Amino acid sequence: MPHMTGPASCSPGILSRCGVAAVTLVVAVTGASAQSVPDTTALQRALAVPTTRTIDAHIKFLADDLLEGRAPGTRGAAIAARYIQSRFEEAGLQPGAPDGTFFQQVRLVGVTPSPSLVVGVARRTMVLQYLEEFVAWPQGPDRSVIADGEIVFVGYGIDAPAWSWDDYKLEPLTGKILLMLVNDPGLRDSSVFNGQAMTYYGSWSYKLEQAARLGAAGALLIHTNESATYPWTVVQNSWSGQQIQIEGQTPQTLRFGAWITERAARQIVRAAGIDYDLMVRRAARRDFHPVTLNAHAVIDIASRVRRFTSVNVIGRLETDHGDDGEIVVLTAHYDHRGIGTALNGDSIYNGAQDNASGVAGLLATAAGLAAAGPPPNRSIYFVATTAKESGLLGATAFIRSPPVPLARIAAAINLDGANVWGATRDVVMLGAELSTLGKLAEAVARAEGLTLLADPNPETGSFFHSDHFPFARAGVPVLFLGTGRDFVNRPPDWGRTETEKYLANRYHQPSDEYDPNFRYEGLMQQVALMTRLAWTLAGSLVFPVWNEDAEFRQAGERLRPGR
């Protein structure tokens, strides 16, 4: 099947006159000097290698029942890692892990919890039903966690000086159990934060981090489809069963994290004699103060604990010109959720779209770029990460122990949940608006005949939930390649509708399986974009930098002072 794009004057897969113009623009926006202009002949070779047949074969294998959902620490994940290594070697990549192999060891702890949650309020005892009304997990590798604490509603649980927002008001919260709203106040008031575009302060991970900083015993996150941006079924499937942590994390006072349904939260608050809706409305104001509910929660979590090692699979394409050890990193996670609760008689969470598709794109990009020859100035590292679904753990391990100093990483480009629905006329690259990579993103999109689309669902906070994010927090500029919305030969709203159907019916469910009807023209577009991005960045002599108003600007300045 030919490499297809939307209607455009650029020939797909080769550098036409439009492509040469795009390269010229790329040189301008990256600050590359004349001697670092990408070799257009080499780029043509790279773009010509990937095929829909090989992409289909990768997805079909990685999403097969044989691999049992590729959960970290399982035989299926080990098979997937070996498969990726073999494809890297076949392409001609060299080992890229710090120890000189293809495998970066990631030491993990798996905790499988069996929790109970009882709330005492106004002489009434409420026993919440596991999975139906709550899920909970220990924050450390503990076989037994028992926590008993007073429940305090802390609104959105945010302390953000840059936004002049503090939900805590210096309230002493040591040993308390915090009841929190998910997302941030911009969800309901477009005049605060980034409006409906979720900030990191709106993510569940930030809220647990902040609760730990304040010495809380636990955190109860209130789920709604709107605020979490996914249904309760995703919570059930993602936070039940084995929960994985990096071995050796610093112990913290926060004993547990939990999600509860809004219905359960309403019952608790109502029993305490408080108007739930009024309380939530007040939480959207800067003058909000924590509300003590005169209620106690007792949680008991007995867990099975196992320690194991998983791997990031890392291959590198070495430059023969650069002498500063600078690199460009391309990522896609290969793990998924393994075997879990059966739905419609199927208990294998195959993860075809999430993220066998992204790994297929990474492998196709690697094969193409390897055929192009040595990159002009920077080496290119291809990183298939483990344990993304458990909290970006593989990417975090890479950041903690990188093959080169972090300051030598020019940029990271991530592919997660690739487009298997067909060609588009536009493309999403999350993070483009945050750094000078934005101009490069526009240029390479134009070279593929595509329009660069802003995040169509900023309220979901997708930027904070995939493997590029640990790079951004460390100060490295990033791009997250997403799926466009304007599909060729489809009705105008088809892309949005298909995304909603996927999230409701397949995301983190056994039904995310290989489909012989997948259409790979869109994924081929993403491979071409990743190829162009990587090759151009590898040819540049300057570092991308964060924009002045980007929340990662300070991290970037700490990483590379003076740039």
Positions of the model-derived regions?
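Bacterial N-terminal signal peptides
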Residues: 17-30
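His/Asp/Glu-rich mid-to-C-terminal helical/loop segments that flank catalytic regions of hydrolases
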Residues: 367, 371, 485-556, 560
